A protein has these predicted regions:
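N-proximal low-complexity "stem/linker" segments adjacent to membrane-targeting elements
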Residues: 1-23
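Conserved nucleotide-sugar donor-binding
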Residues: 163-179
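Acidic ATP/Mg2+-coordinating residue in the GHKL
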Residues: 38-40
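Conserved donor-nucleotide/metal-binding helix-loop-beta segment in metal-dependent transferases, i.e.
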Residues: 132-157
Length: 270
């Protein structure tokens, strides 16, 4: 029996980018089922860093696409973020320093996806441009596999970064070693030891620190990392420059649906 393979996309107010992400997946030969976890809602960002208070309207993902299932969380049907934060105020801490990854919504969404997709999944964000088939990441010996973004625009730390680029979670392997949730608050970077013959990875990076410290079977060869830029930073956020958004759209223009146009015949000789 073939192993179940699922692509999970976390969607937030950017339907045109989610569509482009799905089309880029299909473009590179992946016919795996796609699950879109729709967190779209109206949100007001407070003033700060030289920007006024601003409100982003809700833009849920409504497009019908073959092989795509949408999990509607626009009204908190799956995860009621406000209620969860009230119950666990110290567990979920916002991390909006780098493109919003690590926010409470992302953290709780990934935890929910672990419940909904118990056989493992590849997690991508809506503003990712796939340039090759990600099937190489789907390997049962890995507990975690990821592509790394190297000094891409939007990464103010100037270091390689995994999430939320493109990563594979082997949920059964995680669970076998007592890992039942993913916490970006303690799982930010993964640095491979260049001179270490044991293929060692920096703690305090990918996976939980205590997993790396106390679950040695999840370390080393059971983690795979492949350097590759698969993300054009900044394009998915309404508060970034129009130039950045235009660059993203230009890079993805062949993936967007275009309205049918009536061809006109020019009677003049060419």
């Amino acid at each position: 029996m073939a192993k179940k393979q699922t692509i999970a996309i976390i969607h937030f107010n950017t339907p045109e980018l989610t569509e482009a992400c799905i089309l880029s997946i299909r473009k590179h030969g992946c016919d795996w089922p796609v699950v879109v976890f729709d967190n779209s809602r109206e949100v007001t960002f407070p003033a700060g860093e030289g920007m006024p208070e601003r409100t982003v309207e809700a833009h849920p993902f409504k497009k019908k696409m073959k092989g795509v299932k949408v999990i509607d969380n626009t009204k908190g049907q799956q995860v009621d973020f406000e209620k969860a934060l009230q119950a666990f105020p110290d567990r979920h801490k916002p991390h909006a320093e780098v493109n919003g990854w690590g926010s409470d919504c992302h953290m709780m969404t990934v935890e929910k996806l672990w419940e909904l997709l118990p056989d493992g999944f590849i997690l991508v964000e809506s503003d990712i441009l796939l340039r090759e088939n990600p099937a190489v990441m789907w390997n049962e010996k890995y507990s975690f596999a990821a592509y790394v973004q190297k000094q891409q625009r939007g990464n103010k730390f100037g270091r390689g970064r995994i999430l939320p680029m493109l990563c594979y979670f082997n949920v059964p392997k995680f669970s076998a070693y007592g890992v039942h949730y993913f916490d970006p608050d303690r799982s930010w970077m993964l640095h491979k030891g260049e001179d270490n013959p044991k293929n060692w990875y920096d703690t305090g990076a990918s996976l939980l620190e205590d997993v790396l410290a106390h679950k040695p079977n999840l370390v080393g060869l059971n983690v795979d990392i492949r350097p590759m830029v698969v993300h054009l930073g900044g394009g998915s956020y309404k508060n970034v420059s129009l130039k950045a958004q235009a660059e993203w759209l230009k890079a993805h223009e062949d993936l967007f649906s275009k309205p049918e146009t009536t061809k006109r015949t020019n009677s003049k000789s060419k």
